[in-house]
């Protein structure tokens, strides 16, 4: 906690234009390696921690306090929301930065952005390298931890006519042993 205070407050994105509801991830989930039930993950940070270790330490229900495989699933994979699958093993976002994923209006894919502790939006590896070079206090942030790999949009959960926009106001991100999954729209 002290380290976070020294670096600065977590990034709060400064949006020039609002993103329509349902195009940002609002729920994170991980699939149990044993029972295959989906468990809602409380925060993006916790989700990224699970995803970064998924290959060597698969998620299971017992990793959530008070949870077991005997409990019903927290959330079901269905078309009531748009789901996106994340790749397991992606690194955690460096401290002080915020990774943002935005679903395109046509539901074809997601775009990845990073917000700096000052709120500046970075769209590419070159922009990140330039920011780190210009701000020596962030030189310890490993450039390899800024990953622009985007989750796969699960076509069977996309609304029938994406041009009309989603009838669902949210998105969920999830992770399983073979892949991490994120959901986008409720």
From Swiss-Prot:
GO CC, one annotated term: histone deacetylase complex
Function statement: Transcriptional regulator that binds CpG, CpNpN and CpNpG (N is A, T, or C) islands in promoters regardless the DNA methylation status. Plays probably a role in gene silencing.
Motif MBD-associated domain (MAD), chain ranges: 31-69
Binding-site residues for Zn(2+), renumbered to this chain: 32, 35, 61, 69
Notes concerning its domains: The methyl-CpG-binding domain (MBD) functions both in binding to methylated DNA and in protein interactions.
Pfam families documented for this protein: MBD, zf-CW
InterPro entries noted in UniProt: DNA-bd_dom_sf, Methyl_CpG_DNA-bd, Znf_CW
Principal localisation: nucleus
Region of interest (Disordered), ranges: 154-186
Subcellular location: Nucleus
Tissue specificity comment: Expressed in rosette leaves, buds, flowers, stems, mature seeds and roots.
Keywords from the UniProt entry: DNA-binding, Metal-binding, Nucleus, Transcription, Transcription regulation, Zinc, Zinc-finger
Gene name of the record: MBD4
Residues in MBD domain copies: 83-153
PANTHER family xref list: METHYL-CPG BINDING PROTEIN, MBD (PTHR12396), METHYL-CPG-BINDING DOMAIN-CONTAINING PROTEIN 1-RELATED (PTHR12396:SF10)
Zinc finger residue extent: CW-type: 22-77
Protein name: Methyl-CpG-binding domain-containing protein 4
PROSITE patterns tied to this protein: MBD, ZF_CW
Any one GO molecular function term: zinc ion binding
Biased composition (Low complexity): 166-178
Organism name: Arabidopsis thaliana
Domain of life, per lineage: Eukaryota
């Amino acid at each position: 906690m002290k380290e976070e205070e020294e670096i600065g407050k977590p990034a709060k994105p400064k949006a020039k234009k609002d993103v329509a509801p349902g195009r940002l991830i609002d729920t994170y989930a991980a699939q149990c390696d044993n029972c295959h039930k989906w468990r809602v993950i409380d925060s993006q940070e916790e989700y990224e921690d699970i995803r970064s270790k998924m290959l060597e330490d698969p998620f299971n229900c017992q990793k959530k306090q008070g949870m077991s495989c005997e409990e019903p699933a927290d959330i079901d994979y269905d078309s009531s929301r748009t789901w996106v699958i994340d790749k397991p093993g992606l690194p955690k976002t460096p401290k002080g930065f915020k990774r943002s994923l935005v679903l395109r209006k046509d539901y074809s894919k997601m775009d990845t952005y990073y917000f700096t502790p000052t709120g500046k939006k970075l769209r590419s590896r070159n922009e990140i390298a330039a920011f780190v070079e210009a701000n020596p206090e962030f030189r310890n942030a490993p450039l390899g931890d800024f990953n622009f790999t985007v989750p796969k949009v699960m076509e069977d959960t996309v609304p029938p006519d994406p041009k009309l926009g989603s009838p669902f106001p949210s998105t969920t991100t999830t992770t399983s042993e073979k892949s991490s999954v994120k959901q986008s729209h409720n």
